[in-house]
Design a protein with these regions (language model features):
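Acidic, polar-rich low-complexity tracts and alpha-helical solenoid repeat scaffolds
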Residues: 1-101
Length: 101
């Protein structure tokens, strides 16, 4: 995944970046997960779905740190700016409900 995630221009690279960040987070390494997410944000990718998934993961990281304010900001920004017809809207609503918003 690390090798694949280096080329964010491809859909496979963007997905690999997300999957690797999710792996880090799931295994208690939120620092490396957040670092990888920030790299993707700074580098950019044309694959908006995987970028949106990374922002949701960033919200999950903040929720795990009890920083619901920051998580809410990421989720509301994504809600207002992401318009594709896929599962992202449902993920956003689940997390907003989870933090009581």
């Amino acid at each position: 995944l690390q090798l694949l995630s280096q080329d964010l221009r491809t859909v496979y690279g963007a997905e690999a970046s997300y999957r690797l960040a999710q792996y880090y987070f799931d295994n208690g390494d939120s620092k490396d997960a957040e670092h990888l997410i920030n790299e993707m944000i700074e580098t950019g990718t044309p694959h908006q779905y995987w970028l949106a998934r990374e922002f949701i993961l960033l919200a999950d990281i903040n929720i795990s740190r009890k920083d619901n304010f920051q998580a809410k900001q990421y989720l509301l920004s994504l809600k207002n700016n992401y318009n594709a017809d896929d599962d992202i809207a449902e993920m956003i609503e689940q997390r907003l409900k989870q933090i009581g918003q």
